[in-house]
């Protein structure tokens, strides 16, 4: 009897490899995007939880805790107060990516893998409001750009100075779009009118690495 068993030819195997490669190229970005979106949800929850704890502290003490004296990472400034001393948080939230880039606010550096905390003015009262910031992997969650955060300014003077950042004038983006026509680190403020490919309230970035999620209170 003839042997009816037949193996794959080299050409057939190459075709299978090519098909697998095409499928992987199509599916992998979607999987990575889904994972990034999941991490962004965790970032939003983390910043919201910190903000809630800060409001409880402010209600009890009449002020917000001071930032770290060096890098403006939220954990370094707030963990001992909000977790260890007051018990407002069981654990202090961190970025779901331990190697997430440090988020700079103004001229102050953040810390890798940590959220950033920075106090600003409110109604010309110093340190009466704050910014909590993280990276964002998707434009769906992003509401700010790195350029916007680096434009934040709080002078050392006890009285409000022109150009200082106030809660009432710091505007977040309604959405963030990616375009090569944008500045390197993204928009410094939301668009004030439709034009240049943006709608009023929108911001832009050249690279998703400049996407940020921010809570301002």
Segments from the language model and where they lie:
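Low-complexity, intrinsically disordered/propeptide-like segments
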Residues: 13, 17, 26, 34, ...
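Short, surface-exposed interaction loops/tails
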Residues: 124-217
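A generic helix-loop boundary/linker signal
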Residues: 21, 40, 86, 91-92, ...
